[in-house]
Curated annotation (Swiss-Prot):
Motif (Switch 2): 63-80
Lipidation (S-geranylgeranyl cysteine): C200
Protein name per Swiss-Prot or TrEMBL: Ras-related protein Rab-13
Keyword check for Protein transport: yes
Main subcellular location: membrane
Modified residues (Phosphoserine): S178
Catalytic activity of the protein: GTP + H2O = GDP + phosphate + H(+)
One of the record's GO molecular function terms: GTP binding
GO cellular component, one term: endosome
Species, as recorded: Homo sapiens (Human)
Length: 203
């Protein structure tokens, strides 16, 4: 019996507590939003299969929410990850400043050459914005990675961000692109509905 997919990619979301990692995963995998999720304890993941470049890609998206409060994500979390999404909250400047620490954690624990993506969540809360898009775009360019702003609540750019990372992994595994340096960072300029003020505070 033929497999229902062509490739299996393990993705990992990391970032400070409260930036919305769990909400993003639920939105992507189940197209649902609920701001009363119970914070993740231990390792949890969701699965969704997407079509990219004519291939069926099974994405296994791992959630580290509930662990980052211990200030460490062990090597076990990073093992086998082909793509890592670094998440911050656009209304929380500290969560953005800590992205540098998460970058360091990736360097120390993840496989060399793992694909990375910077993601600013809660862009539906524009009135409470503390991190400007230009700041994040600059950081992404410094690291040679893509950048998106998303809203797990409105679903803005969520599919686009995950699909972009999966496409980069696919192209890299196919040998048609070498290294992150040849990949121009991407900023999605879509705006979110400023009237939406609810937030997902977990993960």
């Amino acid at each position: 019996m033929a497999k229902a997919y062509d490739h299996l990619f393990k993705l990992l979301l990391i970032g400070d507590s409260g930036v919305g990692k769990t909400c993003l995963i639920i939105r992507f995998a189940e197209d649902n939003f609920n701001n009363t999720y119970i914070s993740t304890i231990g390792i949890d993941f969701k699965i969704r299969t997407v079509d990219i470049e004519g291939k069926k890609i099974k994405l296994q998206v791992w959630d580290t929410a509930g662990q980052e409060r211990f200030k460490t994500i062990t090597t076990a979390y990073y093992r086998g990850a082909m793509g890592i999404i670094l998440v911050y909250d656009i209304t929380d400047e500290k969560s953005f400043e800590n992205i540098q620490n998460w970058m360091k954690s990736i360097k120390e624990n993840a496989s060399a050459g793992v694909e990375r993506l910077l993601l600013g969540n809660k862009c539906d809360m524009e009135a409470k914005r503390k991190v400007q898009k230009e700041q994040a775009d600059k950081l992404a360019r410094e690291h040679g990675i893509r950048f998106f702003e998303t809203s797990a609540k409105s679903s803005m750019n969520v599919d686009e961000a995950f699909s972009s990372l999966a496409r980069d992994i696919l192209l890299k595994s196919g040998g048609r692109r070498s290294g992150n340096g040849n990949k121009p960072p991407s900023t999605d300029l879509k705006t979110c509905d400023k009237k939406n003020t609810n937030k997902c505070s977990l993960g």
